[in-house]
Every structure is written in C-alpha cells, then in structure tokens.
Amino acid sequence: MGKWTRRGVLSAGVVGGTGLVIGIAVRPGNPTETAGHLVTGKGENLLHIYLKIDDQNRATAILPHSEMGQGAQTALTQMLAEELDADWDLMRFEEAPADGAYANMALGRGYLFAGVNFPDAVVPTVDGLVLKLADALGMQITGGSMSIRSTGQYFIRAAGAAVREMLVNAASKAWGVPQDEIRTANSRLYHDTSGRSAPYSEFAAAAARVTPSSTPKLKKTGQFTVMGQSKPRHDIPSKVDGTAMFAMDVKRPGMVYAAIRRTPVAGGTLLRLDDSKARAMSGVIDVIKIDALKASGMLGAYSAGDSVAVVADSYWRAEKALAVLELEWSTEGKEQVSSASIFEQFDRDITAGVNRLVDVASGDADAAFDSATTLLTADYRVPYLAHTCMEPPNATAEVTADRAEIWIGCQNPLGFRQHLAANLGLDLEQVTLHNYFMGGGFGRKSNADYALQTAIIARRVGRPVQMVYSRAEDIKQDFYRPAVQSRFKAGLDADGKLIAWQNTYVDKHEPAEAPLIPYAVPTQDIGHVASPTHVPFGAWRSVDHSQHGFFTESFIDEAAHAAGRDPYEFRAEMLKDKPRLLAVLNRVAQEANWGRPMEEGRGRGISLQESFGSIVGQVVEVTVSGGKTWVDRVVAVIDAGYAVSPDGMKAQIESGIIYGLSAAMYGEITIEQGAVAQSSFADYDAIRMHDAPVMETHIINSGAAMGGAGEPGTPGVAPALANAI
C-alpha cells in the first residue's frame, strides 16, 4: 500500500509552476499497446511502458523526463538496470514521447486521494483513473527535483523489477522449470540445475505478453550493484563530440529564421508599427505581429503582451531587420513603476498586514515577545532574477491547416503539445512534438510562450521557421523569480535562547514549506500578505526556497550574534530533536574545520536548509579586501537519503552553488518605467571560471526517503555567503 498526501504533492512546487513528473509502473494491465508504435522500431520489444529490449539484447530505458544538463537520465537508467539485473554496457536510454501514456499521475493522486491507503488489488483501477486526469492536464513536467526521488524510486525501479519477473515467467514456461529455480544476472537468465542460460532478448517477445506485477519485489540497499555507483553519463560522449542534438541544431528543408521582440512593459499592446525599412532589407521575408498569447492548461500565463517578429533567410538578417522597426507600445499605466516603487509597495503592504494569511502559529506571540529580554528586528529584500539559460528559448515549427510539428527543448513536452493544439485549433493527434537536450532550463522552459510564438509565425509564412530569442529578449522577456520582502522579529530570553519568531513576507508561491524553519522555537508566527505586481513570474531553480532560505538563515545568524553565540552552536542547540538535520550541520562544520581561526580580512558563514526532501548544510569562506569580496571555498554536505549516482549528486549540488552565488553576487533585474532594464551579461553577470570557488561536496546516505539534488544546493549558499561577510 502507498500513502499519498496533498501536502506532499503541493510541496513539490507544481502549483507554483515548478511541478513534478512521474510515470508509474503500476497501471491497469500493460499499456504498451498505446505507446508501442511511438517508441519501438525493428527488432525491438516493448515489455513495459518504460523499457524495451532489442534482438541484440540491448535494454533501453524510456524516460518521461527532459534532459537539461542535470544527468537524471543516466541515474534513472541505473535504477532500472539495478532491478532488471541488466548488464550496464547493454543499457541505453531515450526520452519518452510527448504522449499521455507518459503523463504524471502523482499530482492527480494527491488531489483526489490524499492520505488514502489502497489495497494492492485496487491500485491498478485507481491509477487508471488518475492517469486520465494527468493526461487531461498535460503533465509531463521535469522540475521540483523529482526525477530520482519519485519517478525513479517509486516507478522506474518497479518497472525494472516487473520486467525481470516477466522474463523469468517466460523462461520458466519455455524451459518447463519452476520460476524460483531461475536466476538473472548481466542481462541473462540462468537455470543452474540444467546448465541452461539465455539472453533476455530470447524471451523478450514472450515476456511482453505477460501482465506486469503490481507489486514486484524490489532489492534492498545492501543488494545494489549498479545504484550507488558513479557511472559515466550516457549523454556526455555525444555532447563532447558534437553529435548531441539541441533544438537549435534542427534544420528543415526550406527553413527560414525569425527574431522576435515583445512589448517592453509586461501586458503592453502594439500601438504603431512602421516596418518599411525592415521590409526593404535583403533577405527579409515578412514582418508579423503576434497578439498577446492566450493561456490554457496548467502552465498559466505564457505571455505578457504583444510581440513582433521578423522572418528572414538567416537569423542575423532577421535580427538586423528587427532593429530598424519603428515600434510604439502602450505602457498600461506602468510608466511610473520602478524597483524602488515596488519595494515601497511591499513595505506598505507588510506594515498594513491586511488579509494576512497565517502559515504557522504556535504559542502566544504577544506574551512571548513581552517576556523576551532581547528583541531583534530585520527586513530583507531580494530582487527579481532571470534564468539566463546558456541556450536561450528557441524552437523550429512547421504548421499547415491540419498539422503542426515542432522541434524544441522544453520541460513539459505533453503540456506544450496540448497547449499548441488548443491555441492552433487542432486536435492533439494533429500535433507532433520532438523534444531535445536543453542547454539549461531552471524553470524557464516550463513556460510555452516560445513554442506558440514559433508555431504562429510558421503558420503565417507557410514554411518551416526556426525562432530564437536573442540574449536581450531572453533577459527582458523572462518569467522571473519574484522579488520579495520579508520582515522578521525575534525574541531572546536572558540565557540567549530564541523563544519567539515572527515573520511576514509578501506573496506566497510554492513549495508551501519554504518559509518554515527547522529550529525548535516554542512560539512562531509566520504569515504572508498579497502584494501583486505586473512583472511576470515563474519557477526559478529552488523556487521560494531561494528567497526564504536567504531570509531565514540570515536572520538566524543575526539572532546568534545578538545572543553572543557561535552561529553553528546556536543552530545545533535548537536541533536536538531532529537528528538528521543535526547530523548534516555537524558534518559540514567538521568538514569545513569550523573552529579554525580565520586570517585578517577573511570570514566564514554557515547555513542549513531543508528542501525538496533533502537536507543541505553549507559553509562559505570569503576574503574581503578593498571593498571587494572573493568567495574562496564552499563546503557542502547533503543528505538526500541515498545517492544513486554520487558524482551526479555532487555535480548537481555544485551546479546549484554556482547558480546561487551568481544570483547573490551579480543577479538583479531592475524595473525602470515599468520595463526591465537589463539586456545582456554585461549588466546581468554570472560567476566566471576564474571567480569560481573551490568546492567540495560530501554525501550522507542516511537511508531516509530519497530527496532531490538539482535544486537543494541553491538556497543555502546566499545566506552562508552573507553570514561570512
């Protein structure tokens, strides 16, 4: 039986836009019939929705996740290979098609049957119902650090185990021996008593006719031989030799190119367009106005106003022509809006506290603060942030009256496909989507605006079109991490113990637990007020944890200093009843040699953050000289329950550290006269290689439920940096 909670689903960040994606191994029957023609070729047998075996005994994992550099596809393949007892050298992977057979059922199950335990016999029926819901909502999202901890742990492993049992079943019938006399290893079946053996491929066709078990037997941790190993990533060779396909590598016969510009002020409309100069330029084919896109499906608002695109015989010519367009846009009354005015609005709304919604309330806050010996207050602000994927949004599309085909890199292939069908007036079966490797996603590529813009342009010109955002357009037309202000008040008793904690912040997105603290503070009052702005927002790596991790861990340090306590010891005292959190905190302090004195001009800061099912402790060491700050070293410890691929987990944590440091040291989107001011890496910079710190990551395999790795490395680095300074 399995228990699903509504909070568990919501905390994955779906409602806020990040989302999760999981397929499921336990479904009514074996739905390979619906997907077989999409994923199999000559000599291949689809034994399970996630697994096929060819006549050369190669097993291919079919994975419902997009690959944007995180390496999850290799780790998921390890999980399948482990339970399949496969020879790693015979394993392959490919991304699942954008099809309802690979829709995510976890969200629907959480909403419909939160907290319900189902008897095993009922599970297939329940899952059949939930699959229809997930398919209808277009959920095939990669995000929320869910690939390994949900798709892998609960469904891909089960698929591998089920197929292994199916192969044993088929061999048992063919050989006329009991199933319990057959063993599996290295992609082969063995009957030791008779000396017979055969590759999986010999029985693949027969096994494909066997209904998979809804409760296959999974291995215990001590039995793992593939999981827990740092296997070479399957996608690296092609990325090194240049054969890996990204969306911008697509070339179609007769293809033309489009460059695009959207209204500078979100929500604006095009008032005047003079395209005479552009149309006179060599190679220009057309100039197209695109009305504000209409949202549909789960992804929310895809666009923030009108756009204009130039189509030409080369991308360079399209961009050059775009630059000479004479455009006049409406400002929607936002010409007086700036970053300063937005934060003034936040401050007013927090102070007024109108319709404040409570997240946590424990104890009597007024009484606790009245009894406190020391009171401490602070306000924190963080700006809007862009995603700045190294590969900007782009797509290639061919659209006719009765068909649309698109080549793209995105984080929700099924959702994008459904969105295209709805907005183009086509049936889903008339839309084909090919998803490719992404050069970064970070939440930006879960918004389908760039897909629909490309399709609209292609329909208008009647030819294949490749549309690419310039770096300026990418930065100016993002779905930003929200700017937030957060106000704190703390009370300390005569012994310097934290007895009261109050926090009010503007706007709540997801995950729900982001503003909560792990520390044992008897009186807590945490809540939020609404303070909407016109600036488009969306999922950004670690979602609300990126803001609240900075707020809470910075204020904890302020409280430690007010109490005259060491920040590490101050935290540790409040974690005595949370051994897993305390173990991470102790380990990171140990690995960083916390008690070692620092030289003049150098500092050290610590943070602890629980997010996406994982606990991460970080220590940052800095040098401050001449008004400049250098980050010298970052030590991280992660407890994600179990590391399927230790090197992959370390890479994700260190990637998150770099992303978080870039945001903390350089990242700031500012609003001037209602529009975004930044336009390139010249004014929206990132950590460069020569500025990158020495990083070391240590893993604790605690045996707890698996957590994520792609996002948890980001939230804690900013407060640790600030605390060090």
Predicted regions and their residues:
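Cofactor-binding beta-sheet edge motifs in enzyme active sites
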Residues: 1-724
